[in-house]
Amino acid sequence: MNPSPNTQHPTPSSLPYREGRGGSFIFETRMEVRDYECDIEGIVNNANYLHYIEHTRHLFLRSLGASFADMHQKGVDAVVARMNLQYKIPLRCDDEFISRLALRKEGIRYIFHQDLYRASDEQLCFRAKVELVCLVNGRLAESSEYDEIFKKYIEE
């Protein structure tokens, strides 16, 4: 998914910490709803919210100097194991929204709490809990590489 032209990519350290459901948000980016993402009712089709939060995770990783493609070349793939989604207030065509992310680790799972807020009034539109696990050379395993990348955010 391509970001809209006005998408901003702050570094995690430049983001003021803000409490979210899953802890402090450590990353945010802005995006805009495009007309083709909406259904006949004029609201964002439910599947597009998954694109928004996935794109946010990719931008977050890139802001830390890594990428899913680079990790794949090393034989390490972070894959979604489970999602819990809550649709709150629909986004509509041309709405600008803020995607915020918090992260913690439980066992071998990386837990991302991701919220989408309508920029005009900070109304919560969508909330997700996304659990990722790593496949190292095709097998479920701990990833020392991802632990290193995320260490600032997952150390207790």
Predicted feature descriptions by range:
Residues 2-3, 17, 28-29, 92-93, ...:
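HotDog/MaoC-like acyl-thioester-processing domains
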Residues 2-3, 17, 22-60:
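Catalytic strand-loop segment that frames the active site of acyl-thioester-processing enzymes
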Residues 4-11:
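Arg/Gly-rich low-complexity intrinsically disordered repeat tracts
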Residues 23, 74, 121:
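Short, glycine- and charge-enriched coil/turn segments that flank and shape catalytic ligand pockets
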Residues 37, 84, 131:
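Short aromatic/hydrophobic contact patches that present stacked aromatics
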Residues 46, 69, 142:
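Short, electropositive, low-hydrophobicity segments enriched in small/polar residues
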Residues 60-110, 127:
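Hydrophobic beta-strand-centered segment that forms part of the acyl-chain substrate-binding groove
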